[in-house]
Amino acid sequence: MRRRIALPRACWTLAVSKGTKEDILRTYPDIRPERVHVIYNGIDLDEYQKTSDTTALTKYGVDPALPYVLFVGRITRQKGVTHLVQAIRYLPPATQVVLCAGAPDTPEIAVEMRQKVEEARALNPKVVWIEKMVTKPEVIQLYSNARVFCCPSIYEPFGIINLEAMACRAPVVASATGGIVEVVVDGVTGHLVPFDQDQTTTLPSNPDKFAHDLADKISDLMGDPEKARRFGEAGRKRVEERFAWSAIADQTIELYHRLITSPHT
C-alpha cells in the first residue's frame, strides 16, 4: 500500500535496469516515464578480481584440475537452480557441476532440490553441492576457477551475481530475462538462453526445453576453453567500463543534483 501511494507521488524514481523501469510503468501507469531513471548497480572491481587460489575448491570437494560449471545463489523459484540441476542430464557425462546453493525459502523447494540433486548424482557423480552461502573470498575463488558460470533465474531485476562472475573473468550462461539482458552480452560475454514464460506461474512453460537449452549453451563453453577465456576477458572489460562503482556514483550524484535544483520537473 505504501508503495502504491509513494511511487506515483515521487518526483523521481530510480530503477536498477531498463527492465525494472518497464515493470514500474506497467504496474503504475499513472507514473510519467520521464520521472523514472535507470542507474545500474555497481561492483567493487578491486575486491572482485580473478585469483588462482584454489584452497576453497579443495575445502568443498571441487576438483581444481577438472573444468566446472558453477551456480551461486539461494534455493528459490526465482533463482531457477532446479532448472540447472534438471539440465545436468543433458550435459556431457562426468561434467563437473558445482552448486553453491543454500537458504531454501520454502520447505517444498528444499525437498525438491534434494531429490533433483540425488537424481542428477545417480547420472553424474561429479555434482558438488555446497549447501550453504560461502564467504566472499571463497566465492571469488569459485568464480575465478569456473569454466562457466550459470544464472538460470526465472526473473532478475538486475542480476548482480552476473557482474561478480564477469569481474572474475567467468563467462556467463544466463536466462534472457529482466535486467540480465542488460548485463550479459550474448555471444560476447556469454550466452543468453531465452524461454517462454507461463504468465500464470511465471515459470518456463516448457521446463524440459529450458533445461535442454541451458545444457546446450553450457556445453558449448565447457567444450571450447578458448571461447570461454575470450568471453571471460570481454566480461571483465564490460564490467570495468560500465559497472564500476565510481561511474555509478557519478551518475547518482548528477541525478540528485538535478532533483535538488529542479524538484518538480
Per-region residue spans from a language model:
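A conserved mid-protein helix/loop that constitutes part of the nucleotide-sugar donor-binding site
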Residues: P67-F71, T76-Y90, V111
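Short hydrophobic beta-strand element within catalytic cores of glycosyltransferases
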Residues: P171-A174, V184, H191
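Nucleotide-activated donor-binding/catalytic signature segment of Leloir-type glycosyltransferases, i.e.
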Residues: A110-M133, P137
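Membrane-proximal helix-turn-helix segments that form the acceptor-binding/catalytic region
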Residues: M1-T13
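Aromatic "clamp/platform" in nucleotide-sugar-dependent glycosyltransferases that forms part
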Residues: I154
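A short helix/loop element that forms part of the nucleotide-sugar donor recognition site in Leloir-type
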Residues: Q49-V62
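Carbohydrate-associated surface elements
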Residues: G19, G42
